[in-house]
Amino acid sequence: MFLRHVIVFSLIALLTGCAGLTSREAVQGKGDPAQWREHKQQLSSLDGWQINGKVGIRAPKDSGSGTLFWLQRQDYYDIRLSGPLGRGAARLTGRPGAVALEVANQGRYEATTPETLLQDQLGWKLPVSHLVWWVRGLPAPDSKSSVTLDGDSRLASLEQDGWQVEYLSYVEQNGYWLPERVKLHGQDLDVTLVIKDWQPRKLGQ
């Protein structure tokens, strides 16, 4: 089940480039909508980061955990998994139009989009481009969402495209409040992301 785990998380943790800021969202919760808008504007300006952390995957017949490294440089990404989840290593790299997944001792897989790669390998349809937004604590701007704010006007939870995302804790890094512990709940798939180290960047200025 190693390849299945690798493809599931790697592709959920993917992006196909940053879309516009406009978001069709319903807002509720304890926070101030004006402060939330300012928070979104600040985080949307981040187009680069380096993340080190852990990821856990739970599905009806599969489960596992491992370490995560995610390098983002505008529309280029380099995501690596290792540890018990991989029992080895896997690396996912690409930019819009070209995605490659390399799995130790198992081969290389290519597609034009992460969605296509997931569909081809597993036959699953998931909003794999959304995590580039979700990992920053933002709803993806290209579809409707329902957000609940915490007392600090940051995301407490998010519902979008059949997924529920819970933000359990945040950490401040370089003036940005960024998610530290996140749980994603989809149909027959749960993902837990614990980010140990955030290094946010603004590259496109």
From Swiss-Prot:
Instruction: Read off the Pfam families from this record.
Output: LolB
Top-rank taxon of the source lineage equals Bacteria
Q: Which SUPFAM superfamilies does the annotation name?
A: Prokaryotic lipoproteins and lipoprotein localization factors (SSF89392)
**According to the UniProt entry, where is the signal peptide?**
1-17
Sorted UniProt keywords: Cell outer membrane, Chaperone, Lipoprotein, Membrane, Palmitate, Protein transport, Signal, Transport
Bilayer topology annotation: Lipid-anchor
Q: Which CDD domains does the UniProt entry name for this protein?
A: LolB
* Subcellular locations according to the entry: Cell outer membrane
The lipid modification N-palmitoyl cysteine is placed on: C18
> Can you quote a single GO CC term?
cell outer membrane
> Which residues form the lipid moiety-binding region (S-diacylglycerol cysteine)?
C18
UniProt cross-references to InterPro entries, sorted A to Z? LolA/LolB/LppX, OM_lipoprot_LolB
The primary location reported for this protein is: membrane
Q: Name one GO biological process term.
A: lipoprotein localization to outer membrane
Quaternary data: Monomer.
Q: What does this protein do?
A: Plays a critical role in the incorporation of lipoproteins in the outer membrane after they are released by the LolA protein.
**Member of which family?**
Belongs to the LolB family.
Q: What is this protein called?
A: Outer-membrane lipoprotein LolB
Q: Which organism is it from?
A: Pseudomonas savastanoi pv. phaseolicola (strain 1448A / Race 6)
Traced from the root, the source organism's taxonomic lineage reads: Bacteria, Pseudomonadati, Pseudomonadota, Gammaproteobacteria, Pseudomonadales
The gene name reads lolB
